[in-house]
Amino acid sequence: MIERGKFRSLTLVNWNGFFARTFDLDELVTTLSGGNGAGKSTTMAAFVTALIPDLTLLHFRNTTEAGATSGSRDKGLHGKLRPGVCYAALDVVNSRHQRVLVGVRLQQVAGRDRKVDIKPFAIQGLPTAYQPTQLLTETVDGRQARVLALPELKERVEAIDGVQFKQFNSITDYHALMFDLGVVPRRLRSAADRSKFYRLIEASLYGGISSAITRSLRDYLLPENGGVRKAFQDMEAALRENRMTLEAIRVTQSDRDLFKHLISEATAYVSADYMRHANERRSHLDQALQLRRELLGGRRQLLSEQYRHVEMARELEEQNGAEADLETDYQAASDHLNLVQTALRQREKIERYQGDLEELSYRLDEQSEVAAEAQEQYESCQERSEAAEAEVDELKSQLADYQQALDVQQTRAIQYQQALQALARAQTLCTLPALSADDVESWLEDFRAREEEATELLLQLEQKLSVANAAHSQFEEAYRLVARVVGEVSRSDAWQAGRALLREWPALQHQAQRVAPIGARLAELEQRLNAQQDAERLLQECVKRSGRDCDAQQLDALQAELEAQIDTLTQQAADAGERSMALRQELEQIAGRVGTLSARAPAWIAAQEALNALESQCGETLEESRAVTDQMQQLLEREREYTVERDEIAARKGALEREIERLSQPGGAEDARLIALAERFGGVLLSEIYDDVTLDDAPYFSALYGPSRHAIVVPDLAAVRAQLAGLEECPEDLYLIEGDPQSFDDSVFAVEELEKAVVVKIADRQWRYSRFPSLPLFGRAARESRLETLYTEREALAERYATLSFDVQKIQRLHHAFSRFIGSHLAVVFDNDPEQELRQLQQRRGEIEREFTGQDAQTQQQRQQLQQARELAGLLNRLVPQVGLLADETLPDRVDELREELEQARDAARYLQQHGATLAALEPVIGVLQSDPQQHEQLQQDYQQALQRQRLTKQQAFALTEVAQRRAHFSYSDAVGMLGENADLNERLRQRLEHAEADRSRSREQLRQHQAQLAQYNQVLASLKSAFDAKRDMLQELQQEMQDIGVVADASAEARARTRRDELHAALSENRSRRNQLEKQITICEAEMESLIKRLRKAERDYHLMRTQVTQAKAGWCAVMRLVRDNGVERRLHRRELAYMDADELRSMSDKALGALRLAVADNEHLRDVLRLSEDPKRPERKVQFYVAVYQHLRERIRQDIIRSDDPIDAIEQMEIELARLTEELTAREQKLAISARSVANIIRKTIQREQNRIRMLNQGLQSVAFGQVNSVRLNVNVRDSHAMLLNVLSEQQEQHQDLFNSNRLTFSEALAKLYQRLNPQIDMGQRTPQTIGEELLDYRSYLEMEVEVNRGSDGWLRAESGALSTGEAIGTGMSILVMVVQSWEEESRRLRGKDISPCRLLFLDEAARLDAKSIATLFELCERLEMQLIIAAPENISPEKGTTYKLVRKVFNHIEHVHVVGLRGFSAAAEEEHMAQPLEDTPA
């Protein structure tokens, strides 16, 4: 017997109160005794945490922090730990005597959430000498210990030989190891399994009847019938798949038009694009060639235009040069005319100013004389006035000095000194050293006489000087005139130079008068010379344009030749126009014919393709309409033959199907009624008992039992006898054999075996001889052998049937094709080929276009020649009238001579214009130049000497007068003597002052009069001088301008200048007209060239672009053609009728097909992606790839092993037969796979019966369990009434609900749910789907109700409820239920675990004090009988006799809590108290 595994010990490290404590666990009951808070719950919590380290489940409600606000976060674990690393470890020895240490490392996580970090680990192969506390702690200083961290623990364990350390990252792996080693009773694969296990442990820990377990006892006790359920699901999935396949077949059959639509639209989509690219490629080639022709023609035209432009530019340059010369001449003529007009106006101004100057000169001379006399008088009067003023001032000063001297004695001395000074000054001026105050009067009279004499002499000299000035001014004027004309000349040579000038004056006047006649003659000759030059230029241009040399005499012949050439070119242009019109008419006819043939060609091509398809299908050549009708009649006869043969094959196939169905019955029963009877009688079919017989023994046993091989083996015939009377559904012969199906043998018959036969002695008077059958059907091997043969034959018949059906349908399809061909194409199929005629017309149109191109070039050349000839003729028409002028060769010389004469005359005119007035003024005064009045200077010197002498005598007289006036001051020799004299002197001074003031007044009046008169004279003189200077300056400017103009202004000069200007203006206008014409022509030519260059660039760009496109399209087209030919779809895509549609129609056709294809492939991801990729217009090969993908898709949708066709449409039509055959096979398969409602009911009933028997066996183990008034505990398993009704209907009344089970829209689960709802309408199903409800109904557990019942006192069996039981009774009853659950789990998991493993059994019980002694003894007995370990917590008054008891006392030492533990063995066996191994002194880690 396998020994059950046991938990050896529990170790707590660094828990609250337990630093390092190991509890050795008893093999039965371990009791934790102690008061409140002693650590019993902490110990159990450590065990549970090591067993189920899932923080989502752990919740220790009975904690020391009960009622704390953080309890919801703590879950009761954080408060049981101390800071630092903590451990909880279980030491286990399993059935294989393998020691394993499983546990967890716990550590508080810092923070307010009071979280705990848990890491599970396991240690295998640990020797028994090592204790858990030795591994988890390390001794420090002898009496202290330190808790090892998990990495340190790993290092320590791995250092021990043969020991394995495993750390787990998931709880699932941790529990998987514990299950394999037999630590936990069941495999905990998921969180739900862990939750069930924890709920069981929790219910055990807190005791009582757990509602969480009793409400879901089915989940805890009844194992999930996964195999049966999976079989149902697989069968249902097979049925679902079968039905889906059938539905897909029906959809495929119904979507035949859709597939045709897919291939037709794909063909339209791809072929339209294929032919559009083909047309575009051909069009691009034609366009490239056309662009190249246009490019080459444009280049030729550009060269011609450039040559023409160069010629016109050269002519324009010549015209510009001539125009520049003409403009210069015209501007010179205009300037000359303006100069002549300006010179005439200047001459008039000069004459007017000269007259004004002569008048002003005369007036200025008169006024100068008058002003000079007035100036002399004013100066004389001013001197006299100044003298009077001085005298008055002196007298006043003397009188003031005298008055002052009267007051001051010193004044006299001052006056005396002043008198002496005046005397000294008079002596100096008068050169009289002996002058004294006494003789001053005599000298005063003398000097006054000298003053009068000097004044008279001065007046005489002044009169003489004025006369000499007049003579000198005439000589100076004449000398100035001569110097103005000839420049610097000596005064002695002035008379000779003047006479020479006056002698040349008449000749110059005569020469100047010839300017007008010479200018008129010169203008006429210059006009002729200009005309001659213009004619020469025209002649040179004619020579240049005609390309040959010719002189003036050959111009008439050249003009006649040009007129003939113009007529010829005009006639050629008319002929070319008529030819072009004829060619255009022919082109229009060709275009009309091409349009007609293009409209006919698609129908003819389609008819030819249909005819070729018919010929390939029937294998005959159809050359006329009669052959088509004959072939159609032959098809009808072949169809009738194939149809008859197909019906015969179908009958044979049906017979095989029935035989296969009969042999496929389960258990070898050929009649389904036998299975129902066997279930009813509780027996087994004989064929089922011998189902495993070999193929070699099958003939023997078949002959042995003979007709009774379909018998039913029943345990008791007497029990069956009563049921035979009411049998209705049974075979005609029903054999019943009594025997045990589990140990049945063939000893019931007396048998004698013969050669290939047996003799069976049924009775003494009845024997049965049976030969061995050639095809034995007794036993599964024999039936399978026969079925293989039948399957092979059926497949052959099915293949033949499919072939015949295919042939019939093929003939029918061919017949329909013939019918459609006759209705659609027969009228045009045998007409002439329109494409051949189209090719001929295209060739002719190409010839006409080439002829058009050549004719256009020729017409352009003729047009240019005609234009050049007409321009040359216009030049000749202008040149012929000027032939005589071209012959005059002396004209330039005459013009040069006249230009020299005109220049001389103009020089004379300019000289006279500059010096004519001077010579006219010089002529009357030329005589004064003969004598030079040189004495004029001597006279002036005398005048100056007299003037100096007159001033000196005046000063001497004034000085003597002052001495005479101060003569009285000489007597101031002393102050006293001077007082009397001062009175006389004062009177004299006053008298003299009065006379002096009267003289001063008269002098002032005379001075004012002379001053006013002088100012008036000077003002008049200044105005005259200003006017004279202005006139003279203006005259000089006018004369200078006249000299600068350099034009002789005569009467005819203006007329000649105007005529010359008008002639030049006319020539310039003509030249500008020609230049403008040339500029316009050049502009037009440049515009044409620019337009032509743009067209050429565009044409070149278009040509290169088109060539690039053609090249790229060629590469892409090659890829497309390669892809098309490799996949063999060229015949499908190259539809010639589409070649007659334009690009827009083809694009529209492709777009329409694309829209239809998007809808058609919306459900096919692959085709949808390929179609999306094919929409790229730059990748045409992708459309072909899409077409190939459609072909491949359609090929995959058909049976390629049966259908032999490359055409998807034909293959789809051929597939119809195969689909029909598959439909029949799948229908038969569905009938075989169909889940029988009766069989489902039987399976569920059998499973329910088996589980009820298992629960009954579990109840037997609890019959002797008693707690208080509870005498026994049991589980009651009943079938729910609603579900029992469902089972009855499924097994007996299923025919009434065939609408549910035969519906193809409902699965079996859904039909089962609908039936359940129909039978129980009062039950609310909620939001669950029928599929979910049906799957639940396939689970047998949903049919059962489980209750816990107790036999309590006189009440008998009652439902176990906490309210009806005492606390101890409830705890015991709950413990009994948990033991039953653990046993159930072990049995359920036995097949998953090793056969040599018997798992550990351990439960908890907290607060065991509520149990009485008898109940405690019952628990001990239950643990002993079931080999179960139990950990209970009891107060101090509990002292069980068996097991191990730990006394826990929590103490505080040095502010540190620790739990003091004392262990006690059961005293009934050994009444001795022994202390368990005391741990190391608890110290903080």
Curated annotation (Swiss-Prot):
Residues 311-480, 519-665, 832-1115, 1209-1265 form a coiled coil. The keyword Repressor does not apply. Its main location: cytoplasm. It comes from the Bacteria. ATP binds at residues 34-41. It holds the Pfam family SbcC_Walker_B. GO terms for biological process: cell division; chromosome condensation; chromosome segregation; DNA replication. One of its GO terms (cellular component) is cytoplasm. The hinge domain, which separates the large intramolecular coiled coil regions, allows the homodimerization, forming a V-shaped homodimer. Plays a central role in chromosome condensation, segregation and cell cycle progression. Functions as a homodimer, which is essential for chromosome partition. Involved in negative DNA supercoiling in vivo, and by this means organize and compact chromosomes. May achieve or facilitate chromosome segregation by condensation DNA from both sides of a centrally located replisome during cell division. Belongs to the SMC family. MukB subfamily. Homodimerization via its hinge domain. Binds to DNA via its C-terminal region. Interacts, and probably forms a ternary complex, with MukE and MukF via its C-terminal region. The complex formation is stimulated by calcium or magnesium. Interacts with tubulin-related protein FtsZ. This is Chromosome partition protein MukB. The gene is mukB.
